[in-house]
Structures are given as C-alpha cells and as structure tokens.
C-alpha cells in the first residue's frame, strides 16, 4: 500500500530538512508493541546516509556515541556480529559484523561464510553477502556484495578468500588492513564453513606485507593495530601452506574489492543484514512464530526514501514482532523493499531534536541500556 508524505503524517516531528521522526503502537500476534520510525528523503540534497562505525570494523560503541561522534541527526544499529566466543575458549570475540560494509565509498570488509554468521536463521535464498546500500546516485537498493581479490607472488596468483572478516573460508587466505583494528586475528581461523562452533584450525600462517614486500611471518595469527600501507595475510589449512612458500623481502601485491551482483552504480554506503521484503512482497519462508525486538530499514519511492524502523524494548512492549510481521509492517509503512538488521538487545534508534547538541535514544533498549555495536545506519543533514 502507499504511504502519505512523511511530514503529513500526524504526530511527525521534523528533525532536519528531509528527515522526520514519529512513534506509534502496533498490534501484533503476541501483543501490542511500540515502534519508532525515522523517514529520510534522499531527494533532498541536504541529506545523506552513511555507515556509523567506531573507526575499525572489529570494535563496538553505543549507537548514540557513534551518531554524536559522526554528527548524525539520526541513526539505528546495524548488522549482526561476532558477539561471543564461548565455543572457542581463550579466543577473543572480535565484535565484527557478519556482512560486508562500505563507508564513504570505501570498502571496509567482506562477508563471513554463511555457516559462520551470528544471528537468527537466514530466510531461504538469502546469504551473508546481502546488503542494503545507497549508491553514488543517492538511490537506496538491496544488493549483494562479493569479494574479488588476489595475492600476486613471484610464483603466481593466489585467490583471496577474505577481507577484514572474523571468519575465513576453510583452506583460504584473508587480508587484514588498518581498518580491521587491533583485535586478535585468531578467530578468523576458527570454525568451518558450515559450523561456526567448529574447532580452530591447527594449520595457520600469517605474513605481513609492507609497501609491497614481505617483512615478517608467524605460525599463528597475531594481534595489535595494523599500520597504514601494511597488509597482514592470514592463511588456514591449504591457504597457510601457500603462504609458507613466501620469503622475507619477496614482492607481493594484494588487491581486493567488493563486487555488486545487481547495481553498476558504486555504493557510497552499504551494510549487511538480510532482506525480508522485495518488490512489495514478503520473502517466502519468513519466520512467523518467534517474536522479538526488531530493527529494520525500508526502501520506498523508487529508492529515494529510507525508513529506519525500531521497536521498543520496554517491558510493556517487549513481545515485539516476528520477522514475517516486520515485513508486513514495513510494507504498510510504504516500503517496497525492506531489510532486517540486528535486533534484541542491539535494537537502538536515536534522533537529535532541532536545536539540540546531541542525539537521544528514542526506544528503550531491552537490556536496560544501549548495547555497544559495530556499525549502524547514520542520517546526516546540512540544513
């Protein structure tokens, strides 16, 4: 169904040119829940959308802190992430997201294997490479971003299997750059392509490349910040064996990029999650039994309108929505496409009132306080 212009809906607050906020109740299968929505008009040249993140992909901060640090007028939490490592005692959880991420047109990371992801079961036909993004043409889209990369050595070309991600495919090589942060890279060699709780690999190798030459190597993945101009290559199983053939001083060229499956327009912003609504229709097989606090983003008006959606985590409303109900609700709000983001204790929507110096959290996080998260969707206005 269609939706009225955002500023014509009763109870709507104008946050900035092209950005509005409202809240309302939803009667769902498990009870009444309360929703918060920020509507963004991407046709307004005062407005832009970008990734909120703490400056590294393996780091976390509360959404309000991410928004205020970046100067955003509104935002919601983003992708599902590596929140715990109880299945691998002694291995540090990275806090890094499942899916790809692009900020200000720069690719920050690629997606982990489907079997390594954190979060609820994916709907049929979706995967960790799915993204919501906004292109250089200021149009929002649902898409998929796959890694294309290589390591050129004196002996030939090796395929790159990972880029700044907390889990590498079995037998592969991953590249880690300064955007990764300082967290240990050991987790990248744990689990399998089908089971994130699988054992950590016993066959690993790490090579550090600086200014195009191998400068050091180690049998175990390391930790600590990676300097600009430096790439750390981490291999597991067959990937480790290939890296062992490199010698200190040898020339190595590492290349990586994210390739879209649908759009030829470069993305200025993108983050992972999974689609729940496409072309006005809920995806087949969406869960209609498990209700929870939810975060989602809708696309309307030919990709020129974004709807940031979050339900409330207060006790009175915590029954939440099923994923199937999220898809239906986003369609009722006017979305043609919609994308589910991390929910539960991560769900946070912030907005800055006109004239205020900082955002406020508009929903009640279900844990009683904001959960630090690795990324989010930020809305910016120059008006």
Task: Give each language-model segment a name.
Residues 1-383:
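Gly/Ser/Thr/Pro-rich low-complexity, intrinsically disordered segments
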